């Protein structure tokens, strides 16, 4: 994104976007947990479905981002904090305009996938944030399960392998959903991901050659 375009879009960009999204997800989850009848009714009204859109419920084009990423009271705290931190990190690195565009392209991919398959969610949209953060900060450590330190790049590789498996064994709708919902990753981070793979390949090749030379 060039400077002139970024300057024009700056007035429309939402600063600290993930804060509002995480708060919305937290409110929906709290209603589902405390007042299930109202909470699940709200969940059904804000979810992204083709049938709902065809009935003119256009708010679903935006509100689906507020569906909580988990139904577990324990995991939801970790998930919301995690997504807030990586969203904040991306916005600090890119600026609010580029981060808004990245998130917006992910939303658009999710919407197109929903129109094709009948249903969409923010699962892959959230995953795209994780992949972006891992591409920018591959060596940063997080605590897996709150106690096991692991680098972001290894978590990203594990997730990528899992969704590659889903892509291979899943049906056409699964493949369409994965590709479209991760479109922002390919558009914004294709070069960074390729450079990271090349850097890691050179590292492991150098390490292998060094160990091979030491054994002689």
Language-model region placement:
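A detector for small-residue-rich transmembrane helices and their helix-helix packing motifs
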Residues: 1-216
């Amino acid at each position: 994104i060039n400077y002139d375009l970024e300057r024009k879009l700056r007035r429309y960009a939402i600063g600290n976007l993930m804060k509002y999204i995480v708060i919305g997800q937290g409110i929906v989850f709290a209603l589902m947990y405390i007042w299930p009848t109202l909470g699940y009714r709200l969940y059904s009204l804000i979810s992204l479905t083709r049938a709902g859109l065809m009935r003119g419920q256009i708010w679903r084009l935006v509100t689906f981002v507020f569906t909580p990423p988990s139904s577990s009271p324990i995991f939801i705290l970790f998930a919301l904090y995690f997504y807030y931190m990586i969203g904040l990190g991306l916005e600090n690195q890119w600026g609010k305009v580029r981060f808004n565009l990245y998130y917006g392209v992910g939303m658009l991919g999710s919407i197109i996938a929903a129109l094709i398959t009948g249903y969409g969610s923010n699962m892959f949209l959230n995953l795209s944030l994780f992949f972006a953060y891992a591409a920018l900060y591959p060596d940063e450590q997080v605590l897996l399960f709150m106690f096991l330190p692991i680098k972001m790049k290894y978590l990203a590789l594990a997730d990528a392998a899992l969704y590659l498996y889903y892509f291979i064994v899943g049906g056409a709708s699964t493949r369409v959903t994965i590709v479209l919902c991760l479109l922002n990753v390919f558009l914004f981070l294709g070069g960074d991901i390729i450079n990271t793979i090349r850097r890691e390949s050179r590292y492991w090749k150098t390490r292998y050659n060094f160990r091979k030379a030491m054994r002689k």
